[in-house]
Regions:
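Conserved alpha-helix/loop element of class I SAM-dependent methyltransferases that forms part
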Residues: 59, 69-89
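Class I SAM-dependent methyltransferase SAM/SAH-binding core
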Residues: 90-147
């Protein structure tokens, strides 16, 4: 057996020392991969559905607060203000999630039905409704926005916040909203957009494309591809002008969109005609 010299042993130790950062990085990557891929497998056609939101429900509110710096509360308040919610209103909140908008409507005296495809999101929402003391005026039900099990022409106000881009058939959902709306009813849609103009547009696009999927997955305990889907859905959503045209095609008269966060969030308000 060849005897290694002291110099050879030193050289080998130096090589190992230079390799340790790569080994550490590989270990971290393995832990992260195990976190995501040992989780329940989500099929590609489950992305954006109730199945996906069932998984991220426990940490959904916290993730929203961090990723929006708490600004999403103000955007939802603007939605409610734009519809002039009153105590006489019969309101429908679609993609209600954990019921933030439904609760805001109930606090203004409206009778509210919140509909969502995720049971786990609704379970959290019901707890928040009870905590707000609104069980008598806010009800939450499982449902599909493209096939509502509701009578026609019964709602004065219809809302959907940060949810319409996850509906596979957006136009079908808009037509259902018009079907259940009374003539003259107001529709409010709050949704993300990718700013196309302004010096902050590249920053906003990078935030949605990179920060949202990574930070969202870490905060919610979800898989990276689940929040990457949300980023893609924002990138693929129609521009404000084009979406306004689709609202009009469903039977509404749409106002000029209202922009927030340098155009990254858009409020659409329309009247059923």
């Amino acid at each position: 057996m060849a005897v290694r010299t002291r110099r050879q042993r030193q050289q080998e130790a130096e090589k190992k020392g230079k390799r340790w950062p790569y080994a550490a990085a590989a270990a971290v990557a393995a832990v992260v991969a195990a976190h995501y891929y040992n989780a329940t497998v989500i099929r590609s056609d489950d992305l954006g559905t109730g199945t996906m939101f069932d998984r991220i429900a426990p940490h959904y509110d916290k993730a929203n607060d961090v990723m929006s710096l708490g600004l999403h509360h103000g955007w939802r308040e603007a939605l409610i203000a734009g519809l002039d919610i009153s105590s006489n209103d019969n309101a429908l909140d679609l993609a209600t999630g954990t019921a933030d908008v439904a609760i805001l409507q109930g606090k203004r005296g409206a009778t509210v039905l919140g509909v969502d495809p995720s049971k786990n999101m609704l379970d959290i929402g019901r707890g928040k409704v009870t905590e707000a003391g609104l069980d008598d005026v806010v009800k939450l039900e499982l449902g599909d926005a493209t096939s509502l099990q509701l009578n026609s022409s019964i709602y004065d106000k219809i809302t959907i916040s940060f949810g319409i881009r996850n509906i596979p058939d957006i136009d079908s959902a808009l037509r259902e909203m018009r079907r259940v709306a009374r003539p003259g009813a107001l529709l409010g849609v709050l949704e993300f957009a990718l700013p196309e103009r302004g010096f902050l547009a590249p920053v906003a696009r990078a935030f949605v494309s990179v920060v949202v999927p990574v930070l969202g997955a870490v905060l919610s305990g979800a898989r990276f591809d689940e929040y990457a889907h949300l980023a893609r859905s924002i990138a693929e959503f129609p521009s404000p002008d084009r979406f306004r045209d689709r609202i009009a095609a469903a039977g509404f008269e749409a106002r000029e969109p209202q922009l927030f966060a340098c155009g990254a969030v858009v409020l659409y308000v329309a009247t059923a005609v």
